[in-house]
From Swiss-Prot:
GO terms for cellular component: cytosol. It is an enzyme of class 3 (hydrolase). Homodimer. Heterotetramer of two MnmE and two MnmG subunits. Belongs to the TRAFAC class TrmE-Era-EngA-EngB-Septin-like GTPase superfamily. TrmE GTPase family. Binds 1 potassium ion per subunit. Exhibits a very high intrinsic GTPase hydrolysis rate. Involved in the addition of a carboxymethylaminomethyl (cmnm) group at the wobble position (U34) of certain tRNAs, forming tRNA-cmnm(5)s(2)U34. Its cofactor is K(+). It is found in: Cytoplasm. Keywords: Cytoplasm, GTP-binding, Hydrolase, Magnesium, Metal-binding, Nucleotide-binding, Potassium, tRNA processing. This is tRNA modification GTPase MnmE. SUPFAM superfamilies: P-loop containing nucleoside triphosphate hydrolases (SSF52540), TrmE connector domain (SSF116878).
């Protein structure tokens, strides 16, 4: 790739005061900057302690300097790191000294961008750096580290290699018709295609769990008025986040609360009670509730266990299942178990539906069952050494690849159209390439790296 030859510099540590602060320099002038600031030639990859001086020889600070000649560095270029005291004034003086020596101020994420452009890491690994820095739980940090070490990229590369092999076979048959390869008769293409589709489905499922751990799961609390939805929100949040009264329709708008369960991020949304109403304000609240239901990763359908309607909770609101047609993402909460006499428990039906009996007001064991259930929904129990971090962008690319393979299979089996299959295979490979950066527009790269910290 065409990598810019300018030398860049930035403060690489977080803003504020600390024991240690780092100024990072990358580019062809890094070695010259090291000699000017330290006053001597630095031995590569060794720590050198001494004063950092300005152009007049005045000491700015003292600390450790590290010099990494390219290509054996993070960016693939010559890199200098100055580790001094972590005061903002001291660090700014060091940075200004580097700029005086010919560097320019780095853009956000430009160090990682140069590492990507110099093939030191791929795009998924570069994004994992930001994910590791921003991780909100230990599990999310571990997943981001595995992605940084290439776990996700290797899965994508393996899929890409299989697609390339399949494309070679298909396109050879198209280009050399005298070989008379019958795609359907020999079954080879279909077997290879189905193998790739199965593996892609597994990667997509695991990436979805990785994205939930990174971004957090949106949990919508829905149900009839006075079912105890706001009490459940307060119980999960551990504070009085919502007003609770005996008056039906107290909650008239969506209320959002961001919480963590064992370090795992959840975005909990309390909604207006679902019912027919003539009140204009409450009607708007119901419409917003239905919209939130449609956007949820998980729905907690709360019913009052003491009410007759609890026997058939999914008949409470006709539009409910229309708004969220996937029943697998609905957890039934039988609330007020302290009044109904229901035992506190979690039950899973033969079709996979989960029902939890609890008392939101009393908390206790029932609330703990719900917390464990939500952790399981996020993949907390399924994480392993093969887990990795993923982003919504990655999921879109994987879905695009999956759709292309499904379309290509239909073209082959229904019409025997090898040419159309070849095009679908090409599109699937391109979609996978967008994950690692093999196929990425400049606009996409700009958006990704601009979200990084300066100095990263």
């Amino acid at each position: 790739m065409n990598v810019p030859r300018e030398t860049i510099a930035a403060i690489a540590t977080a803003q504020g005061r600390g024991g240690v602060g780092i100024v990072r320099v990358s580019g062809p002038l890094a070695g010259r900057a090291a000699e000017a600031i330290i006053g001597r030639t630095l031995k590569p990859r060794f720590a050198h302690y001494g004063p950092f001086v300005d152009d007049a020889g005045q000491v700015l600070d003292e600390g450790i300097a590290l010099y990494f000649p390219g290509p054996n560095s993070f960016t693939g270029e010559d890199v200098l790191e100055l580790q001094g005291h972590g005061g903002p004034i001291v660090l700014d003086m060091l940075l200004q000294r580097c700029l005086q020596l010919g560097s320019r101020l780095a853009r956000p994420g430009e160090f990682s961008e140069r590492a990507f452009l110099n093939d030191k890491l791929d795009l998924a690994q570069a994004e994992a750096i930001a994910d590791l820095i921003e991780a909100s739980s230990a599990q999310a940090a571990r997943n981001a580290l595995r992605s940084l070490q290439g776990a996700f990229s290797r899965r994508v590369d393996n899929l890409t290699e299989k697609l390339i092999s399949l494309r070679i076979y298909v396109e050879a048959a198209i280009d050399f018709p005298e070989e008379e390869i019958d795609f359907l008769a020999d079954g080879h293409v279909l077997n290879m295609l189905d193998d790739v589709r199965a593996e892609l489905s597994t990667v997509l499922r695991e990436a979805g769990q990785g994205a939930l751990l990174r971004d957090g799961m949106t949990v919508v609390i829905a149900g009839r008025p006075n079912a105890g939805k706001s009490s459940l929100l307060n119980a999960l949040a551990g504070r009085e986040a919502a007003i609770v009264t005996e008056i039906a329709g107290t909650t008239r708008d969506v209320l959002r609360e961001h919480i963590h369960i064992d370090g795992m991020p959840l975005h909990v949304v309390d909604t207006a009670g679902l019912r027919d109403t003539q009140d204009q304000v409450e009607m708007i609240g119901v419409q917003r509730a239905l919209k939130a239901i449609g956007e949820a990763d998980r729905i907690l359908l709360v019913v009052d266990a003491t009410a007759p309607e609890a026997a058939d909770p999914f008949a409470l609101w006709p539009e409910f299942l229309e708004q969220r047609p996937d029943p697998a993402k609905v957890t039934l909460i039988r609330n007020k178990a302290d009044l109904s006499g229901d035992p506190i428990d979690l039950q899973t039906s033969v079709d996979g539906h989960v029902t939890i009996s609890l008392s939101a007001r009393s908390g206790g064991a029932g609330l703990e069952l719900l917390r464990e259930h939500l952790k399981a929904c996020m993949g907390y129990e399924q994480t392993s050494e093969s887990s990795f971090s993923a982003r919504r962008r990655h999921l879109e690319a994987l879905r695009h690849a999956s759709d292309s393979l499904e379309h290509g299979r239909a073209q082959l089996t229904l019409a025997g159209a090898g040419e159309l299959l070849a095009e679908d295979l090409r599109q699937a490979q391109q979609a996978l390439g967008e994950i690692t950066g093999a196929f990425s527009s400049d606009d996409l790269l700009g958006r990704i790296f601009s979200s990084f910290c300066i100095g990263k």
